[in-house]
Curated annotation (Swiss-Prot):
<comment type="pathway">
    <text>Cofactor biosynthesis; riboflavin biosynthesis; riboflavin from 2-hydroxy-3-oxobutyl phosphate and 5-amino-6-(D-ribitylamino)uracil: step 1/2.</text>
</comment>
<feature type="binding site">
    <location>
        <position position="23"/>
    </location>
    <ligand>
        <name>5-amino-6-(D-ribitylamino)uracil</name>
    </ligand>
</feature>
<keyword id="KW-0686">Riboflavin biosynthesis</keyword>
<dbReference type="GO" id="GO:0009349">
    <property type="term" value="C:riboflavin synthase complex"/>
</dbReference>
<dbReference type="GO" id="GO:0005829">
    <property type="term" value="C:cytosol"/>
</dbReference>
<dbReference type="GO" id="GO:0000906">
    <property type="term" value="F:6,7-dimethyl-8-ribityllumazine synthase activity"/>
</dbReference>
<feature type="binding site">
    <location>
        <position position="114"/>
    </location>
    <ligand>
        <name>5-amino-6-(D-ribitylamino)uracil</name>
    </ligand>
</feature>
<feature type="binding site">
    <location>
        <begin position="57"/>
        <end position="59"/>
    </location>
    <ligand>
        <name>5-amino-6-(D-ribitylamino)uracil</name>
    </ligand>
</feature>
<keyword id="KW-0808">Transferase</keyword>
<dbReference type="InterPro" id="IPR002180">
    <property type="entry name" value="LS/RS"/>
</dbReference>
<comment type="function">
    <text>Catalyzes the formation of 6,7-dimethyl-8-ribityllumazine by condensation of 5-amino-6-(D-ribitylamino)uracil with 3,4-dihydroxy-2-butanone 4-phosphate. This is the penultimate step in the biosynthesis of riboflavin.</text>
</comment>
<comment type="similarity">
    <text>Belongs to the DMRL synthase family.</text>
</comment>
<dbReference type="InterPro" id="IPR034964">
    <property type="entry name" value="LS"/>
</dbReference>
<feature type="binding site">
    <location>
        <position position="128"/>
    </location>
    <ligand>
        <name>(2S)-2-hydroxy-3-oxobutyl phosphate</name>
    </ligand>
</feature>
<dbReference type="InterPro" id="IPR036467">
    <property type="entry name" value="LS/RS_sf"/>
</dbReference>
<feature type="binding site">
    <location>
        <begin position="88"/>
        <end position="89"/>
    </location>
    <ligand>
        <name>(2S)-2-hydroxy-3-oxobutyl phosphate</name>
    </ligand>
</feature>
<feature type="binding site">
    <location>
        <begin position="83"/>
        <end position="85"/>
    </location>
    <ligand>
        <name>5-amino-6-(D-ribitylamino)uracil</name>
    </ligand>
</feature>
Length: 155
C-alpha cells in the first residue's frame, strides 16, 4: 500500500507568526482578522500567535529570514500577509516580485505561507480580503496549521 501523509487542521499547541505589511492597511487588517479567526476556529490559542508588522510587502522576505534565524522566537509556521495593488507605474511588478520571494528564503525548518494578494484594482483586493472571494488571510492561516502538522509528521 502507498504511504500517505497529510497535515490536519488542528492547531492545538502550535505557535504561529504572522508578518503583516502595513501598506494598504485597510486590506491587510482584514487579512489579519481572517487569519486570527482561522487560528481561533482551529484551536490555536491567541497567546500562541505573534504578529509582526513591517512597512510593506517588499520587507516580508527579509523579515522571514530574520525570524527563521531567531534564537528568541520559535514557531510552528510563518504566514506572510500583504496586499499589492497595481498602480500606474512598474512599482507593482517590483514589489510583488520581491514579496513572492518569501518561499525562497525559507530553510525548510518550518512552513512559510504566502498570503499576499496581488490585484489589478482596489475592488479586487477588497473582494479577496473577505467579501466575495473569501478571505485569503483565513486561507493562509489554515494552510499554515495544516503544513505545520505535515512537517511534524514528516519529522
Amino acid at each position: 500500500m502507498t504511504a500517505q501523509l497529510e497535515g490536519l487542521r488542528i492547531g492545538n499547541g502550535q505557535k504561529h507568526c504572522v508578518i503583516v505589511s502595513k501598506f494598504n492597511e485597510f486590506i491587510t487588517e482584514s487579512l489579519l482578522k481572517g487569519a486570527k479567526d482561522a487560528y481561533r476556529q482551529h484551536g490555536v490559542a491567541e497567546s500562541d500567535v505573534t504578529v509582526i508588522y513591517v512597512p510593506g510587502a517588499f520587507e516580508l522576505p527579509q523579515t522571514v529570514k530574520r525570524v527563521l534565524g531567531s534564537k528568541k522566537y520559535q514557531f510552528s509556521a510563518i504566514v506572510c500577509l500583504g496586499a499589492v495593488i497595481r498602480g500606474a507605474t512598474s512599482h507593482y511588478d517590483l514589489v510583488s516580485g520581491e514579496a513572492a520571494k518569501v518561499g525562497s528564503v525559507a530553510d525548510g525548518s518550518v512552513p512559510v505561507i504566502f498570503g499576499v494578494i496581488t490585484t489589478e484594482s482596489i475592488e479586487q483586493a477588497i473582494e479577496r480580503a473577505g467579501t466575495k472571494a473569501g478571505n485569503k488571510g483565513y486561507e493562509a492561516a489554515t494552510t499554515a496549521i495544516e503544513m505545520a502538522n505535515l512537517f511534524k509528521e514528516i519529522g
